[in-house]
UniProtKB/Swiss-Prot annotation:
Catalytic activity line of the entry: 3-deoxy-alpha-D-manno-oct-2-ulosonate + CTP = CMP-3-deoxy-beta-D-manno-octulosonate + diphosphate
EC number: 2.7.7.38
Reported function: Activates KDO (a required 8-carbon sugar) for incorporation into bacterial lipopolysaccharide in Gram-negative bacteria.
Protein name: 3-deoxy-manno-octulosonate cytidylyltransferase
Pathway recorded for this protein: Nucleotide-sugar biosynthesis; CMP-3-deoxy-D-manno-octulosonate biosynthesis; CMP-3-deoxy-D-manno-octulosonate from 3-deoxy-D-manno-octulosonate and CTP: step 1/1; Bacterial outer membrane biogenesis; lipopolysaccharide biosynthesis
Gene that this sequence comes from: kdsB
Primary localization: cytoplasm
A GO term, aspect molecular function: 3-deoxy-manno-octulosonate cytidylyltransferase activity
Length: 254
């Protein structure tokens, strides 16, 4: 039996907003004749998700989804984070407390469907956790000290101890560095629906604000995060015009 056939029942939500500083109107950027958010939704539909929903505060994005027959929910303009937007979707859809919701970023048109299945499976397998996510081994030493690369340290059960932009774990003795595996966090998450509602009631945590990493709010409040360690990173998402051109060329060749 294919491992993916064992994936649990889950829903994919894709938060999408037009406000992007580095790439204006990013979700609607054209990639081979389709808006990027539609490309992301089509990749998500190749996963084992029972449904895929775009969550947006933009009527333009909603119109693009309608044109391409992608389910879309118009949400509040006042959400401070994508997680808050997903929580509203869970509420609008009246999801049961134990439902699994996978958050796929709207700028990941090359995300592997198997990775979506895996993050859902990881949460299903860790019943004591309320969130799951993914990390990959860092192979470029320069990334360890790069604050734009978020690192994560795990316990022996594969749960997150801490996420940071700092080099963690810090290697005090260079001779032991070869035995130390640094992990890069990837921004894909699965949540239990009841936790999403609890999350919106939590105050921002001081480590979260210092690092600008919203997942630290969960750890700060005693919630547990399961982390799947994948062998290698998936294709990078789209943050800049250069990224957009790279993705266009890749999809044109496929």
């Amino acid at each position: 039996m294919n491992a993916d056939s064992k994936a649990p029942d889950f829903l994919v939500v894709i938060p999408a907003r037009l406000g992007s500083t580095r790439l204006p109107r990013k979700p609607l950027a054209d990639i081979g004749g389709k808006p990027m958010v539609i490309r992301v939704a089509e990749r998500a539909k190749q996963s084992l998700a029972h449904s895929v929903v775009v969550a947006t505060d933009s009527p333009e994005i909603q119109a693009a989804c309608d044109e391409h027959r992608i389910e879309c929910l118009l949400t509040s303009e006042n959400h401070p984070t994508g997680t808050d937007r997903i929580a509203e979707v869970a509420q609008l859809l009246k999801l049961p407390a134990n439902a699994l919701v996978v958050n796929v970023q709207g700028d990941e048109p090359l995300i592997p469907p198997k990775l979506i299945n895996q993050v859902a499976r990881t949460l299903a397998e860790h019943e004591q956790c309320v969130i799951s996510t993914v990390a990959v081994p860092i192979t470029d030493a320069a990334e360890i000290n790069n604050p734009n690369v978020v690192k994560v340290v795990l316990n022996r059960s594969g749960e997150a101890l801490y996420f940071s932009r700092a080099p963690i774990p810090f290697v005090r003795d260079p001779q032991s560095s070869q035995k130390t595996m640094h992990l890069r966090h990837l921004g894909i998450y699965a949540y239990r629906a009841d936790f999403l509602q609890a999350y919106t009631r939590l105050e921002p945590a001081s480590p979260e604000q210092a690092e600008a990493l919203e997942q630290l709010r969960a750890l700060w409040n005693g919630y547990r995060i399961a982390v799947h360690t994948a062998p290698e990173a998936p294709p990078a998402g789209v943050d800049t015009p250069e990224d957009l051109e790279r993705v266009r060329q890749l999809l044109a060749r496929s």
